[in-house]
Amino acid sequence: NSLEKAADKGELYIDLVTYTVMDMGLDAMSSKYYTKDHSYLNHYRVGGVKLVLDGSPQGKTAWLTKPYLEPPSGKDDSYRGYPKFSKEDAEKFINQAFQNQWQLLAHTNGDAAVDEFLFYINGALENYGYDEHRSVIIHGQVIRKDQIQKIADLNVLASEYAAHTFYWGDWHLNSVLGSPRAEYISPTRDLIDAGINVTSHSDCPVIPPNSLRIID
């Protein structure tokens, strides 16, 4: 890839970490830039793998356990979004990450997607161990309160997208989720209080990479 080529030429001046999307190929995991000790080579390393398990709440493609407040055009009132993968494929990818001891990031916006991720992580831990897996929920905007202790128990991290509400908060309240779900988006305080390691992000280019807005 272009970053590997730049690293090969010594053209990188800051440390960069990338994660390879599992269903798009795993060549990066056999690269010299992936090492078990997480060391950088020429300011670059491959950190692990990523899965995208659902879509976005603002686009009404996040996978929810309860229907959207207002379904998108062409969908009935029972519409809850949808998963990206079959159950078999989701389980296969998560097991593969644990079997190889690759750190796994999972784009999981909806609470149904979070349920799926946690379920298969629990199974992978039973099958392969890897207690220090440090798997990460990416976004986790519609995490339910009852999921938080499970996240903590499984040693899963959460990278929250709290700045999202600055741009789409009204849309979530009035069309996507309604109250009370929209008022519990990205429950960062509850995650921290449960002892879960939390980060925050901009998801650039979805929103601008404004570090102050992320922590505002």
Task: Tell where the protein language model's regions lie, with residue ranges.
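Secondary-structure capping and boundary motifs in well-ordered enzyme cores
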Residues: F85-A90, H139, I143, E183
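Active-site glycine- and acidic-residue-rich loops that bind
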Residues: D23-A28, I138-K145
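Short, hydrophobic beta-strand segments that form beta-sheet elements in well-ordered domains
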Residues: T18, V136-I138
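Metal-coordinating catalytic core of metallo-dependent amide/deamination hydrolases
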Residues: S2-D111, K150-L157, A163, S202, ...
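Short, flexible active-site loop motifs that bind/organize anionic cofactors or intermediates
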Residues: R80, I138, P205
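Residue-level marker of positions within ordered structural domains that often coincide
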Residues: L51, V142, I196
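His/Asp/Glu-enriched, well-ordered alpha-helical/loop segment
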Residues: N95-L105, A112-S135, K145-D153, L157-D216
